[in-house]
Amino acid sequence: MSDILKNDWKNYLQSEFQKDYYINLRKFLINEYNSKTIYPNMYDLFNALHFTPYNKVKVVILGQDPYHGPGQAHGLSFSVNPGVKTPPSLINIYKELHTDLGCYIPNNGYLRKWADQGVLLLNTVLTVRAGEANSHKNKGWEEFTNEVIKVLNKKETPIVFILWGNNAISKTDFITNPKHLIIKSVHPSPLSASRGFFGSKPFSKTNNFLISTNQEPIDWQIENI
């Protein structure tokens, strides 16, 4: 795993792989992958970083932990592979996107188009046991993703941090650079979306901020496939 980062993230995160917490996390993960069903596939663990290089990040959408159903998680928060049914949280994201910007609700949940435009789709924890949400909480991933947020905080180019739910909001303390914008709300899960996610307009707020800082807005429309 220590040489898994193939792009410019390597320059910022390579030293993490030598730290005690990560060595312990790696041992834990080797045992978990060998003895249980773990999502995502181990080769997809760092897809968020691979699909969105450090120098391209304009927006961060921070999730909790990966989807824990068969075939769903592929390393991007909230996204599922083509052919997999769109999960309820993402359906709610699409509903808000429709209300906010008029985007139609697509027939798939594959968010690679966002990642390719500079939207880092990161979970606070990058692995999960099948059928057990939060089963890899407090095993070391939080420390790793804290570091991701810290190095992004140092960027001179303004970034929008979209924090949905308490796990994501807990990262607020690491975002201290006044150039960046933080957008917070409850999680888009059906359990909480009606308590402040719907109507929060995160997508138009993000694009307005990007335009105001002379950056290209995001084309949020995921097309049918």
Curated annotation (Swiss-Prot):
Keyword Kinase appears in the UniProt entry: no
EC annotation from Swiss-Prot or TrEMBL: 3.2.2.27
GO cellular component: cytoplasm
Biological processes, Gene Ontology terms: base-excision repair, AP site formation via deaminated base removal
Record keywords, A-Z: Cytoplasm, DNA damage, DNA repair, Hydrolase
Function: Excises uracil residues from the DNA which can arise as a result of misincorporation of dUMP residues by DNA polymerase or due to deamination of cytosine.
Protein name: Uracil-DNA glycosylase
Organism this protein belongs to: Clostridium beijerinckii (strain ATCC 51743 / NCIMB 8052) (Clostridium acetobutylicum)
Gene name linked to the record: ung
